[in-house]
Amino acid sequence: MRHLTPQHLWILLASTLLAAPPPARAKFLLATTPANSSDVIRSAYPLGNGRLGFLAHGAPFVEVLTLNVDSLWSGGLFEVANYTGGNPSASVAGSLEGGRSWVFENGTGNVTGLLGDDRFYGSYRVLGNLSISVPEQQRGGKTEAAGYRRMLDLASGVLTTTFSADGRDVETSAFCSYPDQVCVYAIRSEALPALEIRLGNELVGSMLQNVTCFDGNGYGNETAHVRLRGVTQLGPPEGMRYDAIARIVSGSSVQTSCTNSTGTLNIVPGNGTTSIAIVVGAGTNYDAKKGTAEFGYSFRGEDPGPAVEANTRAAAAKTLENLLKSHIEDFLSLTGCFSLSLPDPLNSAETPTSELIARYNAKDTTGDPYLENLLFDYANYLFISASRPGSLPPNLQGRWSEGLGAAWSGDYHANINLQMNHWTADQTGLTDLQSPLWNYMADNWVPRGQETARLLYGAPGWVVHNEMNIFGHTGMKSGASWANYAAAAAWMMQHVFDHWEYSQDAVWLQKQGYPMLKGVAEFWLSQLQVDEFSKDGSLVVNPCNSPEHGPTTFGCAHFQQLVYQVFEAVLSVETAGGEADGEFVTNVTSSLARLDKGFHIGDWGQIKEWKLPDSFGYDFTNDTHRHLSELVGWYPGYSLSSFMGGYSNSTIQDAVAQKLYSRGEGNAEDANAGWAKVWRSACWARLNNTERAHFELRYAIDTNFADNGFSMYSGTNTPFQIDANYGIGGAVLSMLIVDLPTAFRDNSTRTVILGPAIPAAWGGGDVKGLALRGGGFVDFEWNDEGTVTKAELKNRSTSLRIVNKDGLLLAEV
C-alpha cells in the first residue's frame, strides 16, 4: 500500500480542506468555473465507490450532487409479471435446421424465428439530486464568487472546490468512500453560513417518491437527515424500491430544523463551527442472487431502508477526518499500483482541463503528452470509481447518469463496449476490481443464458447476445444485424482467460472462471456446422451476423476468431481448472483442429469480414463502418496476432493493415464515436505503426472528449458513452507493450516487447508496475526517440524474455 504523501496529508492533519498544489504527474482535473447544471454530463466531475456515483455541479452556494446507484433500473419483473428475459415461452430451435440449410445454399439468410421481445427491457436511471444551498446568498442574488477553483484529485478520489464571496473563504470537498459505503460532502469556512439541504428528483412524480426530513432534536442519538424513498412504478407489480439518506456527521456542531412542506433540512452552525459534513447512502431492493429459476428470475430482494439507515448511521458516527483517512488509504492502495509518467512540454499541469481539451489539435503530431497522460490516469480513476467488489460492473455510462432513460438503456453492450470498459484492469494492478464483472456474468447471464441456449438453439451450456440489462435478458432482441450475436459470451471468455493469466488465481478459476468458460465451449461444440457452402470440411458458425454490419450468413470472421480463442483457452487451463471430463477435452481438441480460424484474404488484400466470396459485394473498399469486428483476433484478442503467429507474419499484418486503411479513422456518418477511434489506435499499435496509433489517439481526444474528460458518442455531442474513456487506456497500453499469450501447444519461452509504438513526443517517459501474464511486473523507461532502454523485472518466477522494439534483450528469467 502506498503511504500518504505530503500532498495528501493536508486533508488529514491540517484544519483546512484545501488541496496542495498538483504534482508534476498528470493526476488532477482542474476547472476555474463551476460545472454547468444545464450541461451536467459534459461539465461535472464524477465521484464513485463502485455502487454509488456522484456528479458534482452548480454555482457557488448552490451546489448539487447528482446521485446514482448501480442497480437502480426500470423494467424486468419489477414492472411486468411475465417478463422472460427475451426468451420464447417454448423452444424455437427447430427453425435452425431449415435456416442453416438456406444459408449454406444461398450464402445469406435470416434468423426471424429466433428474434425476441424487447418489451420491459428497462433502463438505468438516476436516483436524484442532493442540493446544498446558502439561503442568504440566494435571497440576495449573490452567487458569484472570486478565485473559483475546483480540482478532482485522481490519485485520492477527492474533489475540492474553493472560492471567496462576501469576505468569506469557502472550501468544499466531496468523495465516495468504498470502506464506508457512502458518499461524503463537507463545507468549511471561518464564517460558515446557514445551509439548506434537499434530496429529491424533479423528474419523478410525487406519487412515486416520498421526501421526509428529520431534525434530530430530542430523539435520542438519531442525527438530522433528509430521506428520499421511491418506487419506479406503483404497480402491480410494484416497481423497484430505492432509498437514499443524507445525514449530518455527528461531530458537526449545528442547530437543525425541517421545512416539512419541501422536505428541507435547515442547518445553522453553532458559534465557532467552521465545518459541516454530510454522508449520503442509498440502495435498492435489487438482489443479484435472486436471478435464478429458483426465485423465478425475479431479482427482487429486501426493502433497502434498514440497510441504508444502518449504513449512514455508522458512517455519520465517525469524524470527517476518519472517513477521509480510510477513503484515501483505500484509494491510494489502488492508484499507487501503477504509474505512467509522460513529459509536460507545454506546461499544461496548471491549465484548466477544459482549456487543454479545447486547444488540443489532432493534426499537431506532438499532441499534448500531459493531457494524454491525464486521460490515461482518468481511465483508471473511472474504473476504480465504478467497479468495486459488491457492485455491478460499469455500464455504458459507467456509474453516472442524469436522466430516467439512458441512451441505449445504459446497459451492457457486449460486442465491444463492455469489453472495452475492462481493457486496462489486468495490466494496471486493478485486476481484482473485475469481480463485479465475473459475478454479473455468473449471476445474471449464466442462469437464464442456459435457458436461452436450450430454447433458441437446443444446446447445452449457456449463451447471451448483444444487449443485456440487470434482469437476465439473455435472449435476442428484435433486429438481426445487432441482436443475432451469440458470440458475446465467447468474447467475454477472453477476459476470463486474461484474468487467470494475470492473477494466477487457481481458486477463482476453479470456482467461477472455468465453469463459465466450459459452459461457453459446450455451447459452441454443439453449434458448429460443417461448411456446406465452401465445402472445405471446416467447422463454421451458421447463422451469424458480424456485429451491426452486413447480412445473416455463415463463417463470420469475428465469430470464428472468438470460438478459436475459447477452445484455446479451455485447452490451456483445463488442468488448472480441475477438468475431469476427458471426452469434453477430446471434443474441444478435435473441433479446434477442424475449426475455420476466421482468417481469409479478399480480392483487394484485406482480411475478410465474412467467408462469403467478395463477389457478394459485402466486403468493399472504403467501408468506414465503426466496428472492426474481423480484427477482434488482432486486438483486443490474439487468435490472429499470437495463435496464428500474426505479430511476426507479414501476410497477416498486411491484410490487417489493408482493412484498417479501408475502414477509415472512426469518424463515419453512422458513428463519429471515440471508441471507434481508440480501437483503431490499439490495432495500429499492435502493427508497430507509431504514427497511425498516435494519430487515432489524438483524433479521439480532439473529437470526442468533453470539458470534464467524459467521452461523447458523436463528436462532442451527447450522449455520454464511457467506453472510450476506458478504451483510451487500452490504446496507450498497446503503444507501451505487446504481451501476448501463447497457444496451448507452445512451450517455448514467451517474449514480451516493450515500447512497440511509443511516439517521440513521449520521449523520456517511464512506466512503473505494469503487470505481466503469468505473474510479475515490469518497470521501464525510454529515450527521447521512444525506444525503451531500461527495464526491471519484478516478482517473476517463470521463464520470460523482455525485449524492446529493436529486439534488444532488456531482462530475462
Which residues make up each language-model segment?
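C-terminal catalytic domain of Rieske-type non-heme iron oxygenases
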Residues: 397-398, 402-403, 539-541, 659-728, ...
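Well-ordered alpha-helical segments within folded domains of soluble proteins
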Residues: 415-426, 485-497, 559-568, 627-638, ...
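Aromatic-residue-lined binding/catalytic grooves and analogous aromatic/hydrophobic interfacial grooves
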Residues: 21-480, 498-500, 518-521, 560, ...
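Fungal secretory targeting signals
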Residues: 1-21
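Acidic/histidine-rich catalytic neighborhood
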Residues: 519-573
